[in-house]
Amino acid sequence: MAGGSKTRIHASLVSTLLLLLPLASAIHRSDFPASFLFGTATSSYQIEGAYLEGNKSLSNWDVFTHLPGNIKDGSNGDIADDHYHRYEEDVELMNSLGVNAYRFSISWSRILPKGRFGGVNPAGIDFYNKLIDSILLKGIQPFVTLTHYDIPQELEDRYGAWLNAEIQSDFGHFADVCFGAFGDRVKYWTTFNEPNVAVRHGYMLGTYPPSRCSPPFGHCARGGDSHAEPYVAAHNVILSHATAIEIYKRKYQSKQRGMIGMVLYSTWYEPLRDVPEDRLATERALAFETPWFLDPLVYGDYPPEMRQILGGRLPSFSPEDRRKLRYKLDFIGVNHYTTLYARDCMFSDCPQGQETQHALAAVTGESNGLPIGTPTAMPTFYVVPDGIEKMVKYFMRRYNNLPMFITENGYAQGGDSYTDAEDWIDDEDRIEYLEGYLTKLAKVIRDGADVRGYFAWSVVDNFEWLFGYTLRFGLYYIDYRTQERSPKLSALWYKEFLQNLHENQ
């Protein structure tokens, strides 16, 4: 009874909100190429749940979230959105939106519970086969990420995961298994999602697993060296990517005819002050974020901006490493949410905190007490649509207009378990965000950027890492007491946008 009553209430609310949708929009589906991919994105740990079902082993995030104090609301992804059991329902949600692509990640722990030290798990292969076949039946292209933060805890316990070159062989084996099992139907692969975030938070700040850091970045019980370990971990990520991409290009690409890339978190930076020092600081802040990983993959070495500051702290690439790096990625995945200010800490006095120790630049979202854009519920996430245009143009210049996909872009709502469903569902701010960013994206494509797709984060509310369930990015609201899905106003807007229903006649 209660569930049916909620359904009627939500349906009534959505019907009312539908009347509030603007009659005309500044952006239309027809402003993008006909072949353009429009989709939604998720990740395995954030939505699947079923953390011990189907012979899956523990991941690093399974362990991390069960340690008290790590997650804001004390929650975890044990159940999350229960996508493991409800994937068919979620595929129907995507189909109802009218998207032609779905970006998701594979749980390494489901496929290889013990890494290369054990066998392939048939139940894991079966789950992703069913998911891939289900979305293809709806005319939706799978866009698959191999690793989105979560790895088997076995590899951390056995040899220290990303701090050990052994992981390159493990990741290569995992990639090989996935290419062989799913590559006949998957035409878009990415090796990693936001390794720049995972490395920074895991080995510099200590706020993500494996929780390693040192002062002034933090005081981690597990120890660590924030001045060295992030660069070792990043080096092993880069060479793991190179291992996987060599396997794909030598063994699979010619017959499977797919593309492969890497997804990076990409903040745009503006100088805090109109002075040369801050303009240089923005260049350093940019280089220490995304080119940290992309420059080696495109040009074979770390950015000169990093070499100048870090010197010998950056590992070197051996002749064998450079041989593998000759196999180039086919596209860049750009996760863009926000724009921040950067202030010089190389030639100027600067507060000595953790943020100044990496690129000798302090970053902030405010200037003289004024935010750079409209704040959102996610700290440091501001609404600055110009940022996506400038970010794409930066990649155009630096990487000779290598093909790009906007693999994540979305708006954070904040609340808690007492927030009414109606407050989540009425998300006009998200519509304004999507409309603004898509307008700027269409403009930069008209200016010549080779951007081939856009994925809204996310199709459904989900577990938002350190923030648990206190932040929601979904186009669909989830009542976690019942797992009921309800469309937010933004889902209706996105659907109508994809159908060109906003276009003035």
Curated annotation (Swiss-Prot):
Give the matching InterPro entries.
Glyco_hydro_1, Glyco_hydro_1_N_CS, Glycoside_hydrolase_SF
Keyword list, A-Z: Disulfide bond, Glycoprotein, Glycosidase, Hydrolase, Signal
What does UniProt list as catalytic?
A: E194, E408
* Tissue specificity remark: Expressed in roots, leaves, flowers and pollen.
Residues the record lists as binding a beta-D-glucoside: Q46, H148, N193, E194, Y337, E408, W457, E464, W465, F473
Origin superkingdom: Eukaryota
Q: What is its EC number?
A: 3.2.1.21
* Thermal properties: Optimum temperature is 55 degrees Celsius with para-nitrophenyl beta-D-glucopyranoside (pNPGlc) as substrate.
Catalytically driven reaction(s): Hydrolysis of terminal, non-reducing beta-D-glucosyl residues with release of beta-D-glucose
Residues of this chain annotated as glycosylated in UniProt: N55
- Signal peptide residues are 1-26
pH effects: Optimum pH is 5.0 with para-nitrophenyl beta-D-glucopyranoside (pNPGlc) as substrate.
Q: Which GO terms describe its biological process?
A: carbohydrate metabolic process; coniferin metabolic process; glycoside metabolic process
Give me the disulphide-bonded residues. Answer: C213-C220, C345-C350
Q: Which GO terms describe its molecular function?
A: beta-D-fucosidase activity; beta-galactosidase activity; beta-glucosidase activity; coniferin beta-glucosidase activity
Family the entry assigns:
Belongs to the glycosyl hydrolase 1 family.
What functional role does this protein have?
Answer: Hydrolyzes glycosides and monolignol glucosides. Can hydrolyze para-nitrophenyl beta-D-glucopyranoside (pNPGlc) in vitro. Hydrolyzes para-nitrophenyl beta-D-fucopyranoside, para-nitrophenyl beta-D-galactopyranoside and para-nitrophenyl beta-D-xylopyranoside in vitro. Hydrolyzes the monolignol glucosides coniferin and syringin with high catalytic efficiencies.
- In Swiss-Prot or TrEMBL terms, this protein is called Beta-glucosidase 18
User: Taxonomic lineage per UniProt?
Assistant: Eukaryota, Viridiplantae, Streptophyta, Embryophyta, Tracheophyta
